């Protein structure tokens, strides 16, 4: 239901705005989803696979997005950076037809992302190679097509995962983002060919400057005209330009510029992310030959040396998560709902900023951030001349950086470009790193000057290096930032990676100070904000037997951990209190080094031998005081201000029963949290985040299961093996607990609960109907069923996501 509420007005706007243009849109520009009916084979590398006549016996039927690595078995000999999962060489083939009536149009294929080292062919003709797996790729198919007959699109993907070819985190493998067939006239707006800026913004007016790149693939020069129209969030016309003449030579692209004015603009911000739409029309004489839509927001953004980050002239402390792009059993092949769900959970938690670590995200991820009100650091690279990108840097960095800038420059959520992270060049005592950083920053400034540029510097970085970019990002160096601010008061500081619990001292990042780094960020106005490493657990960057990073505030199933209470308290005004119990015997995957946490859980179950032993209990709160009750007996009332990190420490002898914490402001109890001793598990509770899905073959429902005792208390101390299965018009993507030390593949349908929980991911098919999900618990006689429904798309359905139109 939340999805419908979030997007309904945008669907309505598409239906009612500019009807003449909507009708023409069907004739002049078409964007067809190309995700279905692909064939795939792994590790059968033969260049003949690119041809027309290939036996597809032994090839799998797959749909996009597709990540072949996520379903494979773990191997301790493989890199932990990739979650101990294999790569290899995969081939994809898709047979399709193009109608004879499309002859004379330009037909192109657009891939949002292929990881990695991809070669693309149509009808045996090689179209191109792209090594970097995070860029979009567009290829013109027109010269090679058979009209009214079969065509074959083939893609070879090579992800070898050798030492110098593997990223530091799980990237997945394959055509892991969407694909599109785009049909236009020979004269058309180039892909991502509009550039919208708002250089003047006041309460009375916003000046909107538009640069449009128009491509002419006809055989003669064209004299064209271009018109712009802006509509508001309700679909009403705000302003419209006249037609502006433009001459484009054959085989060339030319730009035209318009300046429009929005009276009394509604500004985009994190609380009210208001959006406008630019409609671009291209005419050849009186004939409309192309239309193009660009969603944008009116806002100003600036990082300053004294006030931090300013959004529309007002300071906004960035409460950020660093996020990679994987999601449990899906790997990196993420449908829209996967991203939407994660961002919904982040928003509720208090996050207002996302750092896309360490690559540009999918285009629809930024569409969601635009609409949900997140500010984003869009990051081009992890490393430059070291690591997996080193072999391609010299030949490809300009193309890859431009790819990000062109695609993402109109998103109001993007407030900062990042050109690199934890770079080897930062340690170089020479000026090589400084020159390289300046080279990349100059490229960004020339191509997209409306935003500032940063890089993320690590421990022991060269002082000169961090002074090159507009904004300097520090990873885990809050203490050094305080002294560097005194040395370099003109620098603009941002914590690009923030430890979740411990804090390093200046000159000793591993001092394990228990003053949470967020305290330094919050207390100093000049620091723009911080981005937690990491917001969530993720696959990769692991040591056997773990297959992922377990030190996030949310686990891989997006369940909030007890350790996340501090930032929830700091990032929200709503009163809250949370109980967490310290126990070093808990079976928790700690992670490593300074990213660890003390062993804590919201659990009150210990062996009988613990009776009477003193247990440490923590209550984290944003209230003035906390009263703690043990089995109904008050253990005291304590002031939050008397304890560090808004966390009050209590010590009390263990007795089975209940612990209740009450948060108090003034004389009022404003928040309550209770944990209790659980008995034996006697029933399974299954909760779907959405009971109705769209029958589009992509939509998802996340079904969480919990072991409960007879009183409904979560049983976290006695996990059980379970099996999930499915009937009807759905596909079981996987059944997974949040324990990253698993032995079965991420797409397995069997697992053991972890702290009483596990999760199934269900995907719709393209047929409406009922979906029945079954859970069988080891040792229990009766299964538990969950019923979902999948509804057909309306005949006139138009996607509400700009990247899907």
Range-by-range predicted roles:
Residues 167, 291-296, 668-679, 782-792:
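Edge beta-strands of extracellular beta-sandwich domains
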Residues 66-123, 128-131, 138, 182, ...:
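Active-site-adjacent substrate/metal-binding segments within catalytic domains
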Residues 30-50, 63-64, 68-70, 87, ...:
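Substrate-binding clefts and catalytic carboxylate motifs of secreted carbohydrate-active enzymes
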Residues 34, 42-43, 82, 87-195, ...:
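Accessory beta-strand-rich segments of carbohydrate-active enzymes
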Residues 222-227, 270-277, 614-616, 622-624, ...:
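Short flexible loop/turn segments that cap and initiate beta-strands
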Residues 102-105, 145-150, 164, 221, ...:
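Short glycine/proline/serine/threonine-rich loop/turn segments at secondary-structure transition edges
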Residues 141-143, 257-267, 648-654, 747-766:
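Short, hydrophobic beta-strand segments
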Residues 122, 205-246, 254-256, 280, ...:
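Beta-strand-rich binding/interaction modules
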């Amino acid at each position: 239901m939340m999805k419908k509420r979030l997007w309904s007005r945008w669907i309505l706007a598409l239906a009612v705005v500019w009807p003449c243009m909507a009708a023409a849109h069907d004739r002049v520009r078409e964007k067809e989803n190309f995700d279905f009916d692909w064939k795939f084979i792994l590790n059968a590398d033969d260049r003949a696979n690119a041809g027309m006549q290939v036996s597809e016996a032994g090839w799998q039927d797959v749909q996009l997005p597709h990540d072949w690595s996520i379903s494979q078995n773990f191997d301790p000999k493989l890199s932990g950076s990739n979650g101990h999962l294999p790569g290899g060489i995969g081939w994809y083939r898709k047979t399709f037809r193009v109608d004879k009536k499309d002859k004379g149009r330009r037909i192109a294929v657009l891939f949002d992302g292929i990881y990695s080292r991809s070669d693309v062919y149509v009808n045996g003709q090689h179209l191109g190679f792209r090594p970097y797996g995070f860029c979009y790729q567009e290829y013109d198919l027109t010269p090679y097509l058979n009209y009214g007959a079969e065509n074959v699109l083939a893609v070879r993907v090579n992800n070898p995962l050798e030492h110098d070819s593997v990223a530091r985190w799980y990237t997945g493998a394959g055509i892991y983002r969407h694909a599109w067939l785009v049909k236009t006239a020979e004269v058309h707006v180039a892909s991502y060919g509009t550039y919208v800026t708002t250089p003047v913004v006041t309460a009375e007016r916003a000046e909107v400057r538009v640069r449009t790149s128009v491509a002419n693939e006809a055989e003669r020069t064209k004299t064209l005209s271009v018109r712009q129209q802006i509509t508001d969030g309700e679909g009403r016309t705000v302003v419209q330009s006249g037609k502006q003449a433009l001459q484009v030579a054959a085989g060339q692209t030319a730009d035209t510029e318009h300046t429009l004015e929005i009276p009394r603009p509604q500004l985009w911000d994190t609380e009210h992310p208001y959006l406008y739409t630019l409609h671009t029309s291209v005419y050849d004489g009186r004939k409309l030959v192309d239309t193009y839509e660009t969603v944008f927001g009116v806002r100003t953004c600036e990082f300053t040396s004294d006030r931090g980050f300013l959004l529309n002239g007002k300071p906004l402390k960035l409460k950020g998560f660093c996020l990679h792009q994987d999601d449990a059993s899906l790997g990196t092949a993420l449908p829209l709902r996967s991203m939407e769900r994660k961002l919904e959970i982040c928003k509720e938690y208090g996050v207002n900023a996302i750092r896309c670590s360490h690559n540009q995200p999918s285009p629809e991820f930024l569409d969601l951030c635009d609409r949900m009100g997140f500010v984003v650091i869009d990051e081009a690279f992890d490393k430059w001349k070291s690591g997996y990108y080193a072999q391609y840097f010299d030949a490809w960095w300009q193309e890859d950086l431009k790819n990000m800038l062109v695609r993402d420059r109109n998103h109001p959520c993007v407030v900062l470009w990042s050109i690199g992270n934890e770079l080897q060049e930062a340690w170089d005592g020479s000026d090589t790193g400084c020159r390289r950083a300046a080279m990349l920053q100059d490229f960004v400034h020339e191509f997209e000057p409306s935003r500032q540029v940063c890089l993320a510097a690590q421990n022991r970085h060269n002082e000169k290096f961090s002074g090159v970019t507009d904004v300097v990002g520090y990873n885990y160096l809050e203490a050094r930032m305080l002294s560097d601010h005194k040395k370099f008061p003109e620098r603009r500081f941002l914590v690009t990676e923030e430890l979740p619990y411990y804090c390093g001292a200046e000159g000793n990042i591993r001092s394990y100070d228990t003053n949470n780094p967020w305290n330094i960020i919050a207390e100093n106005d000049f620091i723009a904000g911080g981005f937690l490493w990491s917001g969530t657990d993720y696959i990769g960057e692991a040591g056997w037997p773990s297959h992922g990073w377990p030190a996030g505030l949310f686990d891989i199933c997006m369940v909030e951990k007890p350790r996340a209470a501090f930032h929830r308290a700091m990032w929200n005004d709503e009163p809250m209190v949370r109980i967490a119990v310290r126990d070093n015997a808990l079976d928790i995957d700690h992670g490593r080094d300074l990213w660890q946490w003390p062993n804590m859980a919201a659990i009150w179950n210990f062996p009988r031998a613990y009776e009477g032993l003193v247990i440490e209990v923590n209550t984290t709160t944003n209230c003035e005081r906390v009263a703690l009750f043990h089995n109904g007996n008050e253990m005291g009332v304590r002031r939050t201000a008397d304890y560090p990190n808004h966390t009050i420490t209590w010590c009390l002898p263990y007795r089975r029963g209940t612990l209740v914490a009450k948060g108090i402001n003034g004389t009022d109890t404003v928040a309550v949290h209770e944990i209790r001793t659980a008995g034996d598990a006697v029933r399974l509770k299954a909760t779907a985040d959405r009971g109705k899905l769209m029958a589009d073959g992509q939509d998802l429902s996340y079904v969480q299961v919990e072991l409960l005792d007879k009183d409904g208390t979560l049983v976290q101390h006695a996990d059980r093996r379970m099996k999930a299965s499915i009937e009807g018009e759905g596909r079981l993507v996987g059944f997974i607990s949040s324990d990253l030390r698993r032995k079965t593949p991420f797409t397995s349908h069997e697992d053991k609960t972890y702290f009483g929980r596990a999760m199934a991911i269900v995907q719709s098919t393209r047929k409406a109907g009922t979906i029945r999900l079954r859970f069988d618990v080891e040792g229990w006689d009766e299964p538990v069923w969950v019923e979902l429904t999948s509804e057909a798309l309306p005949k006139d359905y138009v996607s509400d996501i700009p990247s899907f139109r």
